[in-house]
Design a protein with these regions (language model features):
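Active-site flanking residues adjacent to catalytic metal/cofactor-binding acidic residues
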Residues: 1, 33, 152-154
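Short pre-catalytic strand/loop immediately N-terminal to key active-site residues, enriched for Gly-Thr
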Residues: 2-11
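Short amphipathic alpha-helical segment that frequently serves as the phosphate-/nucleotide-binding helix
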Residues: 3-4, 45, 133-137
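Conserved alpha-helical elements of sugar-nucleotide-dependent glycosyltransferases
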Residues: 13, 40, 135
């Protein structure tokens, strides 16, 4: 509520891991997500590409010009000052990522043909919608079928789970 200037930057739990593995260790990484096909979506794609992360698994969703059907998720973070911590506000309703379904991704191709060795996902993506958790479970099950290592960031944000069942649903 106090900020008057914004700086755009890319980030997110799963992406941060992929970018870190690419930049710090030179590993090939990719993100599996969905973005609205508009200028903000292309900006997000550019941030991901600048991090050296493969974007070929992004599902581009048609944008209607106003966001009635699909949007790109945003998170506003006001820096802390002194003893006051940072304050974050998520704006993630009706996003492309929240609409991504397990059937939208060819998991057999990714874990089988490509032989992806590691899947990293987490609680923030799982909380985006009723079906996001189902998508996570489907991805994890398919990864396990192929012997792919799975890591899961337990990051629990009460504000994201509040409207879909709270902590009980998150567990």
């Amino acid at each position: 509520k106090n900020s008057r200037a914004l700086t755009a930057g890319g980030g997110g739990g799963e992406y941060n891991v992929a970018r870190g593995l690419r930049r710090c260790f030179g590993l090939r990484t990719a993100v599996i997500t969905a973005l609205a096909d508009n200028e903000v979506g292309r900006l997000i794609e550019d941030f991901i590409l600048q991090g050296g992360v493969d974007t070929s698994f992004i599902k581009w969703m048609s944008y209607d010009g106003i966001g009635r059907n699909v949007r790109n998720g945003l998170n506003f973070t006001e820096r802390g000052y002194g003893i006051r911590g940072a304050v974050g506000v998520s704006d993630r309703g009706n996003t492309a990522a929240s609409q991504l379904r397990a059937k939208d991704v060819d998991w057999d191709y990714i874990f089988g043909k490509l032989g992806v060795r590691w899947l990293h996902t987490g609680g923030i993506f799982a909380a985006l919608s009723e079906t996001s958790a189902q998508t996570v479970i489907a991805a994890v099950k398919k990864a396990k079928e192929y012997g792919t290592v799975v890591s899961y960031d337990l990051n629990y944000r009460p504000s994201l789970w509040k409207g879909i069942g709270g902590q009980e649903k998150a567990q």
